[in-house]
């Protein structure tokens, strides 16, 4: 709901979606038409609290909606490969320390087709294509913070390098396992 101007999107509807106005006929100010929102209609939206570039939602608008916070849940990953829940927890612990709890990585990154990842190659792919790019975005102006969250094993940190992702761990499952263990103290 913070991707657009909610007042403009909902228009006059915003005043009649409150619980005490549901099912009551009202005359719309601009068109003069009668309108109501039935009590059994639910408007469900999501809001990304981590993205500061999006539209701010004011208190008057927020009170018209119930909020349910959805945080990463590593327990969902227990049926996946060994160490997967612990890996998510360790990464998020570092993210919380460096940025905020709103920037934690969700458990869905470690799932495929609604199920936790079970194969090392799939986890390598997710790390290369999702986790590292996301962390780079979070820490675009601080190599030191990125290194603290990601460790030294996944990116070439050598002086004068372009900070490219190393290929050795992407192509070798054992090298990847070792990198995870060194960076996060988790055995996968």
Segments predicted by a language model, with ranges:
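C-terminal regulatory/interaction module of P-loop NTP-utilizing enzymes
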Residues: 1-188
